[in-house]
Regions:
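First exposed extracellular module after export/assembly in secreted or surface-exposed proteins
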Residues: 7-219
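A short catalytic or substrate-binding loop motif that flags glycine-/basic-rich loops and adjacent residues
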Residues: 4
Length: 219
């Protein structure tokens, strides 16, 4: 998860707990468009700036100075989407919903986002949208559980291609602000329509998420 800017410098909060601070020179070389883009999540390849530190076993909550490396061909943005509150029965979220071809059940949530590996069918050169939503019924305070429901619209009746990507959905901070959960972590369940014969949302994965991780890290 990316925080900061070109003036104050960037800080990358890894999903493994370590905190990475890239040199300004390597950001300009490898990710020159970062200052003008809305990238919030990314894969990055890097070396540690200090040769005395071991890059194989980075410690959680420890800050490391890094140098981004373009030669590894591994720097790219992760698609990120909003989570919205679904309030109107006449909304098109369900009526235009397309089935997700496949979704990895090993989802994880940290640093303000829930993440999953998703495979979808689409038609090339046709725009598609993706999002997660929740309703009041999806918030179960008594059992410390939140359901998020995944949908996407390929805007195509005849998909011609298939794609796979890690995607990130912004966790809804208002859920923890307006609900009194009894623990400091809750169960997060991700539902989606998968396959071709399902007619309703189906649970595809779940994970534990700390309430503090509903907010993005503060720079």
């Amino acid at each position: 998860t990316i925080t900061g800017d070109q003036f104050m410098g960037y800080t990358f909060y890894s999903d493994f707990g370590s905190i990475l601070r890239p040199t300004s020179a390597s950001v300009q070389e490898v990710l020159p468009g970062l200052s003008t883009s809305s990238v919030k999540r990314a894969y990055v390849a890097f070396d540690l700036a200090s040769e005395a530190e071991n890059g194989q076993n980075l410690e959680s909550n420890k800050i490391y100075d890094i140098i981004l490396r373009s030669s590894y061909y591994a720097n790219y943005a992760i698609p990120t989407y909003r989570t919205v509150k679904y309030t109107a029965a006449s909304d098109t979220l369900i009526t235009k919903n397309q089935r997700v071809q496949e979704i990895n059940k090993d989802i994880w949530a940290i640093n303000g986002y829930v993440n999953a590996l998703v495979t979808i069918n689409y038609q090339q050169n046709k725009a598609f949208s993706m999002n997660t939503y929740y309703t009041e019924e999806d918030i179960d305070v008594a059992n410390n559980t939140l359901n998020l429901n995944l949908y996407y619209n390929s805007h195509s009746e005849n998909p011609t291609a298939q794609g796979q990507s890690v995607i990130s959905f912004k966790l809804p901070e208002e859920v923890i602000h307006f609900n009194q959960f009894s623990t400091d972590s809750i169960k997060l369940v991700l539902n989606a329509i998968t396959g071709y014969d399902d007619s309703s949302l189906t649970k595809v994965g779940e994970c534990k998420v700390a309430l503090k991780d509903f907010s993005e890290p503060m720079y």
